[in-house]
């Protein structure tokens, strides 16, 4: 983004939406790292609570979906191209990782179920009954 220029000569990195997306990815990644370090510590001390594990799963899966979506927005149409497509940026890895990240929102338990675990086990809220 620093070296890439738009048709009018401006650098991509100077665009407000690019800076905002990169900042959100950086901040979200740092928050996730701290969350996982805490989870690793509590696990090694046999203190891991189901609500903490569910919180990390929900946050991580949704963070990666949003981060890859943000990267595809920055790359424009070329970021949405699959591997071996002419003009694909980063050999189509961003598009592939975006699709893979979507699976994380339901693999290992849907995020809706994980939110129920957080509510019941972490917040002592009653079980939701439709």
Can you annotate each of these PLM segments?
Residues 1-130:
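Alpha-helical interface subdomain recognition
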């Amino acid at each position: 983004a620093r070296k890439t220029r738009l048709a009018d000569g401006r650098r991509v990195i100077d665009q407000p939406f690019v800076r905002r997306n990169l900042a959100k990815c950086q901040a979200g990644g740092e928050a996730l790292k701290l969350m996982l370090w805490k989870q690793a510590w509590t696990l090694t001390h046999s203190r891991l609570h189901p609500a903490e594990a569910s919180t990390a799963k929900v946050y991580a899966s949704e963070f990666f979906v949003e981060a890859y979506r943000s990267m595809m927005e920055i790359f424009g149409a070329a970021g949405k191209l699959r591997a071996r497509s002419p003009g694909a940026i980063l050999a189509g890895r961003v598009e592939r990782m975006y699709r893979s990240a979507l699976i994380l929102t339901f693999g290992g338990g849907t995020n809706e179920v994980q939110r129920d675990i957080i509510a019941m086990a972490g917040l002592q809220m009653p079980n939701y009954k439709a």
